[in-house]
Amino acid sequence: MSPIPERAKLHIAMVVFQTGYAGNHVIMRYALNLGVSKLVFPLYRTIVAFSVLAPSAYFLEKKERPAMKISFLIQFFLLGLVGITLNQGFYIFGLDNTSPTFASATENVVPAVSFLMAALLGIEKVEWKRKDGIAKVVGTIVSVAGSLVITLYKGPTIYQPSLNIVNQTIKPEEAEEENKNWTLGCLCLMGHCLCWSSWIVLQSPLLKKYPARFSFVSYSCFFAVIQFFGISAYFERDLERWKIISGGELYALLYTGLVGSAMVFAIQIYVVERGGPLFVSAYLPLQTLIAAVLATLALGEHFYLGGLIGAILIMSGLYLVVMGKSWENQALCQQQQHMISSAASDFGDEEDYHNNKPRSPISQPLISS
């Protein structure tokens, strides 16, 4: 038995998830500045993720993998389309026309959208009159508010690093503003958030029918590779755009493929299965905080009062959501214990009735044999 409690594993997994994905925004922006194809790069990224996930699924889930059905294949195809192909496509076009900070900030609507979708579909139970339901709703709102504070309010500088760990060679974004379509970027990022929310929520019911997690994400990646290849082959006819021509592009590809896709997909589906879709989406605002801290430590950017206030709100919101889930589990356990006690009591009453039932005064048969 593992010395680490199950709930602690979920929290650690989501912190690792958000830390890795916070760097994904900066790495993707770097790759776009290098001039990678916005269609071919996601294809290569998904191939890298698939090449890691598929062997894991084959060797680790040989005996656990359920028999494949046509209905499963259709659902995996749709999950690959919504959760990977459209999700990454909208994201990369949105990031190309906005900025990493803005892209990270818009993703903070995912908890609210996921929560609403899960509640409407009955996947996430919300008891509005109980403290656990109120805590989950308020916690989600507070976390989103904290991430918006980090994005929209700077305030005075409270920490100024003495040196930059990373020497920035990327040209300032202001120099590229004339090439950006901000409206298109916002619309694409809205599509990205809607796809991500749908992906998180729709994984939960299918996982109950197909609980092999690595196989689950491998099939989704497989269909996404086919979809990306078809789209790229049709729209990207220049073979030069299919080449990886620099070490920077290769580094960006490996990071986004191994960390931004393979690791993120594996952790996400693990936590969706064990903690539910709300648990996954509730941690997304933490990404904005981590991105701000990484920018301060690695790029020498100032840390502002708004970042501190936002951090406090995000952590408070996460605490409320976690406590809400804990109270919900306690309520479920109490309900189960009450049902068991009631059933045992009913069984005992029936047993007493049979034991104490009046016996017939006739001790001999009416007709002798």
Swiss-Prot record:
Start and end residues of each EamA domain: 24-150, 194-323
Record carries keyword Repeat: yes
GO molecular function, one term: transmembrane transporter activity
Keywords of the record: Membrane, Repeat, Transmembrane, Transmembrane helix
Compartment list: Membrane
Alphabetized InterPro entries for the sequence: EamA_dom, WAT1-related
UniProt GO cellular component terms: membrane
Transmembrane segments: 12-31, 39-59, 72-92, 103-123, 133-153, 182-202, 214-234, 252-272, 278-298, 303-323
Topological relation to the membrane, as annotated: Multi-pass membrane protein
Region (Disordered): 348-369
Protein name (Swiss-Prot/TrEMBL): WAT1-related protein At3g53210
